């Protein structure tokens, strides 16, 4: 453990001080809401109800003036705690904007130490800047190349910390500004009170997303800490440089971690790590779900499982049972990952071999990584969004009844095209055609409800080609790009898979089943 602690001290030498005064600078809040920051790895779209851009700038200046008062935050908390329910509601409506923009500005500030670590790296210019690394679909070509040669897989759900206070010591390694950490504890305390209040009052549930960007940053920091030790142990377990093809949004921080890894040459430490030495161990993650696959024996996977459980217990101080991390052989197991049901299939082939006058057949087996659309969970997501019933029967969307016909068709078409674009890597398209059918008929019934007619009468009057023009736009483009190898008819089946390298986030309907 002493060698490991020495490693962390060297790797975390770049720590920043005095971040708290940045909250009094207007440019921080400009960065938080600037359109140019939408490419940030922590960006989340934000809406303010009842405020335009000009009034927002005025309120930001007023907020900075109030923050110069020493007890501004203390008075806000006491005001909301003493007045009970009425105090809570008044607090949410009067201080919602102030609290929200402070948390957004604070999120930008605490990201600064992580960004400076990447900029200060001497090898930063050597890091490839390919935009394809941002695509979520770039994980699947990696799985296609690797999983067909592996034997065991473990489907892992990274547990959430029992208390958010556990996340503060993680940031203490990177940030030594004590006032900033106290402000972080203030937001965590406020969030805890907000959760207990919202459970009994659904009318103001929208405010539960007030600090979404901040808590995504904290969660990414927590998961990054898990991967920090995982990468460290992986680098110690082999003498050759490992090739990392994993893609995730916080890739810049991942590169920073990779470049700051220091080899600890100690005989006793190497003896401790010998059970984890496996050159065929692969790890991918998206959000809180990870996959650990290995070519080694089942015993090696069990050692990794108990290591992770003990690591979570002693380092993050919460309990996790080993039996919740299942280890399965790849040939008999299917797992959900990023909206796909993935598995490794065995394809037998008979090859005819002829030598001189003798000929004989050779039976050959090929392993193939296969991905299909999980139709039942996806229909469940459509049912929650009120596009169909639980059994998949299309229904109208009365909430959109006040929109124009073009807007209704455009919204349904956009959802359908996004799903088609995301699930273009499926080997079986029949499930995707069923989803398209549900959305088409739901769109027709929404238009019929608006015009007080029936879906059949509406389609007979306008023609079915009106809807097909919107829903088949992407298929026509792809058939133009791949005219010979990959036909894209409206109905039919083809097994060609296309992974799109421009998808940086999961569709909302797909995100519910991940």
UniProtKB/Swiss-Prot annotation:
Keyword Lipid metabolism belongs to the record? no
Q: What is its main location?
A: plastid
Is Aminoacyl-tRNA synthetase set as a keyword in this record? no
The entry's family comment says: Belongs to the intron maturase 2 family. MatK subfamily.
Please state what the protein is called: Maturase K
Q: Which GO terms describe its molecular function?
A: RNA binding
The gene behind this protein is matK
Task: Name the source organism.
Answer: Erythronium revolutum (Pink fawn lily)
Q: Where in the cell is it found?
A: Plastid, Chloroplast
The job of this chain, per UniProt, is described as: Usually encoded in the trnK tRNA gene intron. Probably assists in splicing its own and other chloroplast group II introns.
| GO CC term (a single one) | chloroplast
Q: A GO BP term, please?
A: RNA splicing
Please name one Pfam family that this protein belongs to: MatK_N
Q: Where are the transmembrane segments?
A: none
Q: What are the UniProt keywords, alphabetically? A: Chloroplast, mRNA processing, Plastid, RNA-binding, tRNA processing
């Amino acid at each position: 453990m002493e060698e490991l602690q020495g490693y962390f001290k060297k790797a975390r030498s770049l720590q920043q001080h005095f971040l708290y005064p940045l909250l009094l600078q207007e440019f921080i809040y400009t960065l938080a809401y600037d359109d140019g920051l939408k490419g940030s790895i922590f960006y989340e779209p934000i809406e303010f109800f009842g405020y335009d851009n000009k009034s927002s700038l005025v309120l930001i200046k007023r907020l900075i003036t109030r923050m110069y008062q020493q007890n501004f935050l203390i008075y806000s908390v006491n005001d909301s705690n003493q007045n009970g329910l009425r105090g809570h509601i008044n607090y949410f409506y009067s201080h919602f904007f102030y609290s929200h923009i402070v948390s957004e500005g604070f999120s930008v500030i605490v990201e600064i130490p992580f960004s400076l670590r990447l900029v200060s790296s001497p090898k930063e210019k050597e890091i490839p800047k390919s935009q394809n690394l941002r695509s979520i679909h770039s994980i699947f070509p990696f799985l296609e190349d690797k999983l067909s040669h592996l034997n065991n897989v473990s489907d892992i759900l990274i547990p959430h910390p029992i208390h958010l206070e556990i996340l503060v010591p993680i940031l203490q390694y990177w940030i030594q500004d004590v006032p900033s950490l106290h402000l972080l504890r203030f937001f965590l305390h406020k969030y805890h009170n907000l959760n207990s209040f919202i459970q009994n009052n659904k009318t103001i549930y929208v405010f539960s997303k007030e600090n979404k960007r901040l808590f995504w940053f904290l969660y990414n920091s927590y998961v990054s800490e898990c991967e920090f030790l995982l990468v460290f142990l992986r680098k110690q377990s082999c003498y050759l440089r490992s090739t990392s093809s994993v893609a995730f949004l916080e890739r810049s921080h991942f590169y920073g971690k990779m470049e700051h890894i220091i080899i600890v040459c100690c005989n006793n430490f190497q003896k401790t790590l010998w059970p984890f030495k496996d050159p065929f161990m692969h790890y991918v993650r998206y959000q809180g779900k990870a996959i650990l696959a290995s070519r080694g024996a089942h015993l090696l996977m069990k050692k990794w499982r108990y290591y992770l459980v003990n690591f979570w217990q002693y380092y993050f101080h919460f309990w996790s049972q080993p039996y919740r991390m299942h280890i399965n052989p790849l040939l008999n197991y299917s797992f959900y990952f990023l909206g796909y049901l993935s598995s490794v299939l065995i394809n037998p082939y008979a090859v005819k071999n002829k030598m001189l006058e003798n000929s004989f057949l050779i039976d050959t087996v090929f392993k193939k990584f296969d991905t299909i659309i999980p139709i039942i969970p996806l229909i469940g997501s459509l049912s929650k969004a009120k596009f169909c019933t639980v059994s998949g029967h299309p229904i109208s969307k009365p909430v959109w009844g006040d929109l124009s016909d073009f807007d209704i068709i455009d919204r349904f078409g956009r959802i359908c095209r996004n799903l088609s674009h995301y699930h273009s890597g499926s080997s079986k398209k029949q499930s995707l055609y069923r989803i398209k059918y549900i959305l088409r008929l739901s769109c027709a019934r929404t238009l019929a409800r608006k015009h007080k007619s029936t879906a059949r009468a509406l389609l007979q009057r306008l023609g079915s080609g009106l809807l097909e023009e919107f829903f088949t736009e992407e298929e026509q483009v792809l058939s133009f790009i791949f005219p010979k190898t990959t036909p894209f008819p409206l109905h039919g089946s083809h097994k060609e898979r296309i992974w799109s390298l421009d998808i940086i986030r999961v569709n909302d309907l797909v995100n519910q089943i991940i």
